[in-house]
Each structure stands twice: as structure tokens, then as C-alpha cells.
Amino acid sequence: IKLLMSMGLKNVIMTDRKGAIYEGREGLNPIKEEMAKITNFNKEKGTLAEVIKGADIFIGVSAPGTLTQDMVRTMAKDPIIFACANPVPEIFPDEAKAAGAAVVSTGRSDYPNQVNNVLCFPGLFRGVLDARASDVNDEMKVAAAYAIAGLVSDEELTAEYILPAAFDP
């Protein structure tokens, strides 16, 4: 989340089982307290279904079935869905698209746009080793993201192909 915010995302609202995470919410662990300080500046409260209304993007790293078609329908026009729970995503691509999603990505290899760490780690770590770096900083992560994005040409870019497949040549 910190990296996404550093790249310009503005209105980020994180949720957990109890709903929106915001500064001052009772019962937050130290990590969630830290995230509450840099996200949800309007201190929106409520369930995922309540705070997702009007959202452009959903990034899920939680549990199967967390996002419903009704929730997708309440999002902004042509929302982008990253449903990365594995092996069963927060919502399946066909369901998300039927509800109006423009782009859908999952952590599964049997659907287009698989988000898989195999796209990043070999090259990122090769660069870290070659540079004899002692840590992986945000600049390196951003460079890796741009390098991966650059593997899909403008001619190839479609809603079904925003990320290269792990086994693309």
C-alpha cells in the first residue's frame, strides 16, 4: 500500500473482517494502525460493500467470495479488479465482468492477467545481486514494475492482456 500511495494513489481504503480501517478504530494491531495513518483520510466507516461504492479499483488479497457482483456494480464505471486470493479469488473473472468490470486479474494461471510473483522475483533479485545491494528499496520495486509493464507492448495491450504470462517467451 505504501508503494502504491507513493506512486500517486490518493483515496485508498483498506478493509478487514470488521470493515474499513481508519485511524482511531478500536482493536487495530500495530500494522493496521500504521496503515490507518496513511490511508482513508476521510475516516470512512462501514463494510467493504459500503466503502467500495464509487471505487475505481479493488485489490483483494483476502478470501474467496469477498467481492460480490452487487459490490462491483456499485463501483465506478469500468472498474479494475485484482482478485488475488488463491486458489479461489475474491470474485471469479466471469462474474466480475458480468457485473461491469473492465479489467480483471487473479492469482490463477488458468485465467488471463495472472498476478504472479514469478514475474518479478528472478529479475529483481538478479539486479539486487548484481548491484551488491544490501536491501530492496522502493526505487527498485518501481523499476521492476515498469520493466514488467514494458513487456506488454501497446499493440498487445487489451483488457485480457495487461500482464505478461509467466511463460511468455
Show the residue positions of the predicted features.
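Glycine-rich phosphate/diphosphate-binding loop of Rossmann-like nucleotide-binding domains
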Residues: 1-59, 63
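Predominant activation on well-ordered alpha-helical scaffold segments within soluble catalytic domains
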Residues: 1-2, 36, 49, 56, ...
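Short glycine/serine/threonine-rich phosphate/pyrophosphate-binding segments
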Residues: 1-2, 22-23, 65-70, 89-91, ...
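Hydrophobic alpha-helical scaffolding
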Residues: 3, 38-48, 57, 61-65, ...
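Secondary-structure transition/capping motifs at alpha-helix termini
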Residues: 4-12, 75-78, 98-104
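Generic beta-strand/beta-sheet core signal
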Residues: 7, 15-17, 60-62, 75, ...
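Long hydrophobic segments that form regular secondary structure
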Residues: 44-99, 132
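Adenosine-phosphate binding glycine-rich loop
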Residues: 83-169
